[in-house]
């Protein structure tokens, strides 16, 4: 009995000690263009690896053996959250330690699941995590961009579920959303996501976790992209580049790293490789690591994240899972990467010394990129999605669309209804900087607005104007039935004052030719220039 008590007290003491260590675990702070440890002020460099198993590498059926069911619950999501399954993360942490990794990039987590075991175990191992706020089914679509309530609720849920872990290094508000000149307008929506995520963290009084963006390295857009996310009143806290220029046994000069380093030497926020590791040669020699963490680059870049941990069809992994899924097999890349990471020690600067350098530089003010045929993202950003406004659609409008099982029916419904009424109030255009009153609402809510407008246009109809079992007919609700606040004031009517049921000329959000850039004076004749031309013509007429 005495032995049992001694063991019990030892376990309690160990747990308490572990919790004390976690409470003292230093978070990573952004200061100027560097990352610093919050406790010592020592500069932090990422030695990271991308960590996201796919259904091909792990079973979607969570095993969760020997784990309390209240702690971890299986998920129906069509992606695997490695930070919510201790069988995955605890298996892999020893391999991370051998690699010399101090940062994981995880592209999608399930905010409904518990992450305590994995996040605390990573913390005990000195490993930080940088998280993407999106997930495959809920993200900003570069081809039809929107910053809507569905995506915003997802982002908030991830922030809510992960903010308490001190080893959360930061959040990505987007990843390669703009990837060439054809979709630069999508960046306006990502920048709005950066703005709202930062504001939300501040409003909730959470630890000041930085929010940034991860871009590709497209030659035509990289300069404008890098300026856009740090110009004006809304600025990303950090900027990651998915960089694959250095392949095999290249060099600082040949790879393009020299040019990129020169371009970003005065960048005002931390910049790093959010992915790197070209695989044209296998096994990868990772010779770029000596340059990235060496004197040629370490004064500009804050390290990087190797793509990736798991071997898949794309052949970027450093481990391959055996058939039982329980035993990672180290590939040749693993030992090379481990040797490379463990042998580099970048020259760091203290926060105190860096403060003096910042004082000399002064405040930065970057101009937003000029609009052109290569860059069309407007400086005017979409509004913060208003949950109350969007819910008012469901509470007050006569025709309410329920979620459709067949997703192709959404397009059919849009094509029909926008041919009957003016859909300008649900349009979102990052080129013109125009965002309709209900452009921030969900797809179902947007269609509900337009279906209801068509119903109201047809004065004698007693049903919704589109045959579907997924449309709930609520009729034209009386004012007395409208939702009210505690003071008895109507909540919703203010949102529908400008609703126009008549068919008018529509704003075409898909039209992205240069002629549409009149909102900021691109390829247009200014008022002053027109007056000059008129005076010139008058002079000619006088002479002749």
Task: Give names to the regions the model predicted.
Residues 185-300, 327-330, 355-377:
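Noncatalytic carbohydrate-binding groove/subsite architecture in carbohydrate-active enzymes
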Residues 155-185, 212:
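Active-site groove signature of glycoside hydrolases
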Residues 284-355, 446-451, 455:
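Substrate-binding cleft of secreted/luminal carbohydrate-active enzymes
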